[in-house]
Curated annotation (Swiss-Prot):
HAMAP family: RNApol_bact_RpoE. PROSITE patterns: HTH_HARE. It comes from Ureaplasma parvum serovar 3 (strain ATCC 700970). Residues 3-74 form the HTH HARE-type domain. Residues 149-160 have a biased composition (Acidic residues). RNAP is composed of a core of 2 alpha, a beta and a beta' subunits. The core is associated with a delta subunit and one of several sigma factors. This is Probable DNA-directed RNA polymerase subunit delta. Belongs to the RpoE family.
Amino acid sequence: MSRQLVDIAYNAIKNNKIYNKKPFTFDDIINEIVKNSNVNLVEVNSQLGVLYTTLIQDTRFISIGDLEWNLRERLSLDEITKINNAMYEVGLYKDSDREEDEHEIVKNDKLTQSKEQEESDEVSSLSDFVGYEDEDEEFKNNNTSNKDEIEDEEELEEEE
């Protein structure tokens, strides 16, 4: 449905002399859709998000900034290039990518250090448990010696 609405808007704006070489707004697009179709404003408003997304993806339209649009076919290649350069600020992505890469490297280094520290802590914690084996043996020995003492005491009591 939204593709059909964009087609209606394209044909209406292309054939309307008011918009000849003159930018138009998203509201103008909506008004042209309502005027040139059997779709009412409520139906169009319920489709605004999808309509806007479809409009952005449609190569016949170009956003020229400041919430204004134009038909790509009405602009020269130089004008389109200027708009694209202004919109995307040529070179900005390379700089921001480099900054993001550096940020990612620092972030990954911190994560690696954190994981290494956790592993180190786990190893030291596990080494604490290694000593428990000796303590278990000591406990067993104490229990056996305690049992022996109890048995000796029971024997003495029986003799008496």
